Amino acid sequence: MIDRYKHQQLRIGSVSPQQISTWANKILPNGEIVGEVTKPYTFHYKTNKPERDGLFCERIFGPIKSGICACGTYRVIGDKKEDPNFCEQCGVEFVDSRIRRYQMGYIKLACPATHVWYLKRLPSYIANLLDKPLKELEGLVYCDFSFARPVAKKPTFLRLRGLFEYEIQSWKYSIPLFFTTQGFDTFRNREISTGAGAIREQLAGLDLRVIIDYSLVEWKELGEERSTGNEWEDRKIGRRKQFLVRRVELAKHFIRTNIEPEWMVLCLLPVLPPELRPIIQMDGGKLMSSDINELYRRVIYRNNILADLLTTSRSTPGDLVMGQEKLVQEAVDTLLDNGIRSRPVRDGQNKVYKSFSDVIEGKEGRFRETLLGKRVDYSGRSVIVVGPTLPLHRCGLPREIAIELFQTFLIRGLIRQHLASDIVGAKSQIREKEPIVWEILQQVMQGHPVLLNRAPTLHRLGIQAFQPILVEGRAICLHPLVCKGFNADFDGDQMAVHVPLSLEAQTEARLLMFSHMNLLSPAMGDPISVPTQDMLIGLYILTSGNPRGICTNRYNPWNRSNYQNERISDNNWKKKEPFFCNSYDAIGAYRQKRIHLDSPLWLRWRLDQRVIASREVPIEVQYESLGTYHEIYGHYIIVRSVKTEILWMYIRTTVGHISLFREMEEAIQGFCRARWYLS
């Protein structure tokens, strides 16, 4: 629907018969109202033109060719000089043929038909509101049962005679055989009610607010009851309480959306626009038709037969009328959801007909494939790989993708800087990939964010904004901390890239969708940018030390593995673990391949009173000739003078630990500086 502010929106729900009639009916310039489809025909076999009042009627749905009526007369669309703007002979308006994409029709049902989605889908909304078993309602809808109808303050014949002990009774072999069509109609209108009309009467008589009040009272009474000690009874009470909660929620939803319960029973059946259920002529003259057309034909055939029985024939047994009403109900069920009640209806080639539910649901349905999953301009797709050097808000975009996505902006940049005379020259430079093109591309991308999306987009963090930079290769580089929001990993996952074009879209992406602006989960409030998967494995390897376990990382003078520090250049074995005065020397030795990433080493460290004051006994004490001595512990060494004063200390660590500590220290210092600037 389109509101008064011209905002296009879609709302799915039940509508009244009056609303369906308003959508489908249109008044021709001669005052004639058209919109009802009464014939089950599509095209005439001789003229190949749509049948009048059929499923493809041009009077109802509009002309097949713009400005050409069914007679072949041509008029200019929108020309006010030509009057009238429709053909008086065939009744077709001279309008654009695109009207056949949205102009609806309707079928006036001879008897009400229950919407199978509200009856058979679990939980059943109709059974919930009426508080009756689903099997009894199904028997009522499909004319297997009926109930006695009480007339206001007047006893009915059936209740006086006591034929119906309960409200629901079988009538198949007792009542309708004794009445003709006219007599049975009179009898049914006063005494009994059956079919979808009975459901509609009960739904129309509901007061939703009374249902809410009664359900709340019953729920409180059940909550006050103590446990009976019988497990079966306790479960029964629990299920009843859950049912009452669902009933209250459903009634509140109907009140909030201004939907009447009786709208779940159809009196007018909408007919889709013809362009949404086309008939296509293949090579060789063979016609291919949508399954929806055949299902509509079944409904119209059976509905017309029932209408003839009710209006023309006066001697038809009531059983035949009830049987035909059941056939109409089953035809409507098949149209809406084929196979939901029984075995699905098949065509001559034993192929199941695709009903309306099959057309719109699933991955290949109308919404997910055509509306949500359709191809988008200025977008690309590629595999994601880790970008360990990227900031959190940046992503690496392959040159091949970037030059295509930003081609329009790139052409404008080349022309503005007088590097190309026109669009043709700019495209030629882009095609030849001249060096100046990459410089202009970097300038264009510098302030233009891109959107990365990973399907399925189940929550807000499934699509985020990044500042792109050019990278080599054909894969998108991504910071590993943003993977949790996307639920992605680097085992072959793909992501789509979208370029926001308008200034409004770019502003929204920069203010609301940037990855560094979405650090917390919108659902739970927990941190979402936390190390996972690859980062955890990398941190473990970086800080694991000895691969044989954490206990072997302690200094042990009797463990020869403590002295096995291999120098890769000359393959010599050093007898002592190396000592370094600062972290820069240790990292330099690692870059020169003198030590491994997990090789134990001794690093001179600032004095830590918490370590010194501990009561740990040294493993070994080494004395030097000048009187100084070294107290060697499991993870540190204290160097003391002759007077037992502490001169300095060394800690036992690895290059991996040093690298992690430096990164954490820089991050904390940067955070403190940012906090100081803000304060």
From Swiss-Prot:
It is an enzyme of class 2 (transferase). Gene3D superfamilies: 1.10.40.90, 2.40.40.20, RNA polymerase II, clamp domain, RNA polymerase Rpb1, domain 3. It is found in: Plastid, Chloroplast. PANTHER family: DNA-DIRECTED RNA POLYMERASE (PTHR19376), DNA-DIRECTED RNA POLYMERASE SUBUNIT BETA (PTHR19376:SF54). InterPro entries: DNA-dir_RpoC_beta_prime, RNA_pol_asu, RNA_pol_N, RNA_pol_Rpb1_1, RNA_pol_Rpb1_3_sf, RNA_pol_Rpb1_clamp_domain, RNApol_RpoC1. Coiled coil: none annotated. One of its GO terms (cellular component) is DNA-directed RNA polymerase complex. Its cofactor is Mg(2+); Zn(2+). In plastids the minimal PEP RNA polymerase catalytic core is composed of four subunits: alpha, beta, beta', and beta''. When a (nuclear-encoded) sigma factor is associated with the core the holoenzyme is formed, which can initiate transcription. Keywords: Chloroplast, DNA-directed RNA polymerase, Magnesium, Metal-binding, Nucleotidyltransferase, Plastid, Transcription, Transferase, Zinc. One of its GO terms (molecular function) is magnesium ion binding. Mg(2+) binds at residues 489, 491, 493. It catalyses: RNA(n) + a ribonucleoside 5'-triphosphate = RNA(n+1) + diphosphate. Zn(2+) binds at residues 69, 71, 87, 90. Binds 1 Mg(2+) ion per subunit. Binds 1 Zn(2+) ion per subunit. It comes from the Eukaryota. GO terms for biological process: DNA-templated transcription. Belongs to the RNA polymerase beta' chain family. RpoC1 subfamily. Its EC number is 2.7.7.6. The keyword Zinc applies. This is DNA-directed RNA polymerase subunit beta'. DNA-dependent RNA polymerase catalyzes the transcription of DNA into RNA using the four ribonucleoside triphosphates as substrates. It comes from Oenothera argillicola.
